[in-house]
């Protein structure tokens, strides 16, 4: 592959507490910066094998995800190159990680694994709040994860320009601000009805 094509992929389920961390980081990268046309920011969500095309077309792949490495909750790590197989053997928290491991393995078998792969991962603090957003620990790590992703991309020679306007990677109703706002209003209404 002679042309550079960079895929920055946020993985996880937005509706399952810290499981959505990777997608939230991808949203920030999309919202805050303008990228060269050969860089694509992707909400990979929990799409599994549907992500194979993105992976196989990339020369550089940056994965953003919540990963259970058994570390202190809220710990942020960046792994690159030969350290990526550790991602494949980490404790799986959800089906998307099993299927994304399969995506990477299949791309490798087919001879289309990106030449450069890195991962920015967070040890989750909370996963038992289905329908909930990020825990406070995970939310506090969003700026650091954004900076870690930017540092990895800069190591690959990719430096974006700051965006002057706000942009949404997903549907506006799924943005963290809107999702949290609706959830908080619903919670308060429920509390008022009960009390």
Swiss-Prot record:
Keyword Hydrolase annotated: yes
Protein name: Hydrogenase 1 maturation protease
Alphabetical list of PANTHER family matching this protein: HYDROGENASE 1 MATURATION PROTEASE (PTHR30302:SF9)
Main enzyme class: hydrolase
GO molecular function: aspartic-type endopeptidase activity; endopeptidase activity; enzyme activator activity; metal ion binding
NCBIfam families named among the record's database cross-references: hupD, hydrog_prot, PRK10264.1
Functional summary from the UniProt entry: Protease involved in the C-terminal processing of HyaB, the large subunit of hydrogenase 1.
Family: Belongs to the peptidase A31 family.
Keywords: Aspartyl protease, Hydrolase, Metal-binding, Nickel, Protease
